[in-house]
């Protein structure tokens, strides 16, 4: 992600008026660290199964699976542990809901928090059974509209 953030910084600074706050609250950093410790176990194995263009060929699926299992373990085992991860995520999503200050931006103003957190939440929409708190669901939906990025609810497994 560091390279992606470098691109975000460059575009924000060089094209038009700067709009992103660089502030990331410590509570958001802590939330990302906690959820980041396990969310790949929920999402990664599903990516090859939800019809994404990057996985149209078996060779792409095989390569991705080989590389990612080195980090998260067997895909089938991760899928089998979904309920365990969902139980953990439920509390973490409730913590995030308490930190959301606006449906259009976590801190009330578009910031790096949104650039970092929205992709995590978007990826979680590929997991069937997640109960997003209303504030989190509103945020995900609004950010998807603002960024013109589709969510995976209709493909969730």
Q: Which residues does each predicted region cover?
A:
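GST-like domain detector, emphasizing the conserved glutathione-binding G-site
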Residues: 1-63
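Short, hydrophobic secondary-structure boundary micro-motifs
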Residues: 19-23, 106-109, 151-155
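GST-like fold's C-terminal all-alpha helical module
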Residues: 35-141
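Alpha-helical oligomerization segments
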Residues: 130, 138-157
